[in-house]
């Protein structure tokens, strides 16, 4: 669907969450991270092919059990991982196998990227941006959660 909408220049955006039984509004990437990766793979492929995308991104979750800010940080990290994995897909060989109709080899290119640990890349990017390497630990250590709990009492 994503590739089709991109091709038709009709892709407006995404509201990311995850689901098991219905529109559960669960943490992005918590149930099916491969699906999230495949979405980002199509977006990266389109940009790689020179398309200019104007896509709106939104996280649409209902934080009922987990702490809201922490769950949002988990979602953002899952999105970052999916995007980083999409960036390392070997586009040259993927295209070759697709054109040859070699579905098994094309799928292996995708699964190899998906199964790669991209956290070192993400840590490096965070370091270069001057943001915490571990956002949840940083949030917990900051005292902010306790501060807002007290303010709401």
Give each language-model segment a name.
Residues 1-153:
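Histidine-acidic metal/acid-base catalytic patches
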């Amino acid at each position: 669907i994503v590739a089709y909408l991109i091709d038709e220049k009709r892709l407006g955006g995404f509201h990311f969450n995850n689901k098991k039984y219905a529109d559960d509004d669960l943490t992005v990437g918590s149930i099916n991270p491969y699906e999230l990766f495949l979405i980002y793979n199509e977006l990266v492929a389109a940009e790689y092919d020179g398309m200019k995308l104007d896509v709106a991104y939104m996280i649409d979750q209902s934080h009922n059990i987990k702490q809201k800010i922490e769950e949002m940080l988990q979602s953002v990290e899952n999105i970052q991982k999916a995007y980083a994995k999409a960036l390392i897909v070997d586009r040259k060989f993927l295209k070759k196998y697709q054109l040859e109709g070699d579905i098994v080899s094309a799928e292996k290119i995708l699964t190899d990227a998906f199964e790669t640990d991209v956290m070192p890349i993400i840590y490096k990017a965070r370091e270069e941006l001057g943001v915490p390497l571990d956002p949840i630990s940083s949030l917990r250590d900051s005292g902010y959660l306790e501060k807002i709990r007290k303010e709401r009492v």
